[in-house]
Amino acid sequence: HDAYCGDEVAYGQIIGMPARFKAPTELIEKALSLNNLPDCKDLHVKAGLTVSGEWFVNSREKMQQIMDHFPEATAVDMESCSIAQVCHIYQTPFVSFRVISDVPLKDNKASQYYDFWERIANGSFEVTKHFINLIHNPSLIHNS
């Protein structure tokens, strides 16, 4: 979200790379099917655009800049795009799971952050475990 490589490419696009990296539909469907599993139903797995950059969103101005360029963004992080670029170069399917720790610019972000650490370990493990199982056993989608 914070890269500018001139007017020849889209805002945020690195020259020689796609403007956006799209996960394979099959992986997105498997990820969303996790919502139907009892161990994951409270985790609210969603699909959407994650924008990635080199600075932490800690002001209204930074958040507004992101929303001006990417109004459909559902998450902001500092890692996903670099991982997606490497996967693109090596032609490796990629999907990113983000556990949202806080909503930028909310008054209760400190409490959101501390509550996040209570939830992250079990939630991340369950999502990862079940997603890997779905990749190796596609029939599990229909049994949930």
What are these regions (language model features)?
Residues H1-F70:
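Mid-sequence, gly/pro-rich, charge-dense loop/helix-turn segments that line enzyme active sites
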Residues H1-Y4, A75-E79, V103-K106, N122-V127:
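Short, surface-exposed, polar/charged, turn-prone segments marking secondary-structure boundaries
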Residues D2-F21, Y90-S96, W117, I135-S144:
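Noncatalytic linker/hinge segments flanking ATPase motor cores
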Residues K22, E26, E61, M78-C81, ...:
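Conserved active-site and cofactor/substrate-binding residues in soluble primary-metabolism enzymes
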Residues L34-H44, I83-T92, H130-L134:
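A structural motif corresponding to the C-terminal end of an alpha-helix
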Residues W55-K109:
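A C-terminal functional module that forms or caps the active site or interfaces directly
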Residues P104-H142:
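His/Asp/Glu-rich mid-to-C-terminal helical/loop segments that flank catalytic regions of hydrolases
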